[in-house]
Amino acid sequence: MPRVKRGFKARQRRNKVLKLAKGYRGARSKLFRSATEAVDRALNYAFRDRRVKKRDFRALWITRINAAARINGISYSKLIHGLKQAKVEVDRKVMADLAVSDPRGFAEIVSLAKANA
């Protein structure tokens, strides 16, 4: 089999990895092999955590809504059930924001849910 000289493409590939590893500590930003491992791991964590972030924020919104709902005398599950019955389509992100920034507006939504629960 003939020898393959990769020319500038090999350097391009290595430089791409080293550029991604910029700012890493020690050999991980200097040596190609160490940098490759570090970058692969970092990209895997980034991929995983983009999905985990969605779960974490949904849990945070639910916690905030539950706290505000209990101040208004209703549990989270009854609030959501009442809103579904009333055909109110407000997502959890908006409701959590309302609960924090506009308690009166949130109380109106709660009263709507209580009427239809």
Swiss-Prot record:
One of its GO terms (biological process) is translation. GO terms for molecular function: rRNA binding; structural constituent of ribosome. Keywords: Ribonucleoprotein, Ribosomal protein, RNA-binding, rRNA-binding. CDD domains: Ribosomal_L20. InterPro entries: Ribosomal_bL20 (IPR005813), RIBOSOMAL_L20_CS (IPR049946), Ribosomal_protein_bL20_C (IPR035566). It comes from the Bacteria. The keyword Transmembrane does not apply. The keyword Ribosomal protein applies. One of its GO terms (cellular component) is ribosome. Belongs to the bacterial ribosomal protein bL20 family. Binds directly to 23S ribosomal RNA and is necessary for the in vitro assembly process of the 50S ribosomal subunit. It is not involved in the protein synthesizing functions of that subunit. This is Large ribosomal subunit protein bL20. The lineage of its organism: Bacteria, Pseudomonadati, Thermodesulfobacteriota, Desulfuromonadia, Geobacterales.
